[in-house]
Amino acid sequence: MMDKLQGWWRSISAREQRLVAVGGSCLLIGFCYWIVWQPIANRIAERERQVLSQQQTLAWLKEKGEEVLAMQGGQGRQIDTSGTLEGVVNRTAFNQKIKIARLQPQGQELQVWIDTVQFDDLLIWLASLADQHGVQVQVIEVARENLAPGLVKVRRLQLSRPQ
């Protein structure tokens, strides 16, 4: 194969050899450009567009965040720490229609027992205690037992509120 190619190369004139060499070089350069360089350049341009888009999104989010903070007027979440822990637990449980079976104060903590309660209502009540009154759940033991779906029994709930 190589002998045939060399024989053909010797059989053509010097002018044709230059023409074939220049044409082959152009084809090689074009091949490198379209197969290697062009895809890389396209990917780089696409990444630059993505970065620009993400920077614009970040700037927009920062602007909107500042607007939200300005609308809040610098007011943070207010935690009501008035009243005793027992009073807060009784009042909020009554408001959430949760029937407490027993309360037992233990120093700075409070033990609570609830016979049956909707699990979702229990979570909402505990979240409101934490968010609005700063009450923390130290220990919770919940059992489903033989209750209807969605109902649970709180065997032990230990609550505290930092002073």
From Swiss-Prot:
Membrane-side (Cytoplasmic) residue stretches:
1-19
InterPro entries recorded: T2SS_GspM, T2SS_M_periplasmic_sf
Q: Where are the transmembrane segments?
A: 20-40
**How is this protein annotated for GO cellular component?**
plasma membrane; type II protein secretion system complex
Looking at the Swiss-Prot or TrEMBL record, what is one Pfam family this protein matches?
Answer: T2SSM
* Subcellular localization, as worded in the UniProt entry: Cell inner membrane
- Tell me how this protein sits in the membrane: Single-pass membrane protein
Q: Main location per UniProt?
A: membrane
Q: Please give a single GO biological process term from the UniProt record.
A: protein secretion by the type II secretion system
UniProt keyword list? Cell inner membrane, Cell membrane, Membrane, Protein transport, Transmembrane, Transmembrane helix, Transport
- Which ranges sit in the Periplasmic compartment? 41-163
Q: How does it assemble?
A: Type II secretion system is composed of four main components: the outer membrane complex, the inner membrane complex, the cytoplasmic secretion ATPase and the periplasm-spanning pseudopilus. Forms homodimers. Interacts with ExeL/GspL. Interacts with ExeE/GspE and ExeF/GspF.
Q: Which family is this protein grouped under?
A: Belongs to the GSP M family.
Q: What does this protein do?
A: Inner membrane component of the type II secretion system required for the energy-dependent secretion of extracellular factors such as proteases and toxins from the periplasm. Plays a role in the complex assembly and recruits ExeL resulting in a stable complex in the inner membrane. Provides thus a link between the energy-providing ExeE protein in the cytoplasm and the rest of the T2SS machinery.
* Record's protein name: Type II secretion system protein M
Give the species: Aeromonas hydrophila
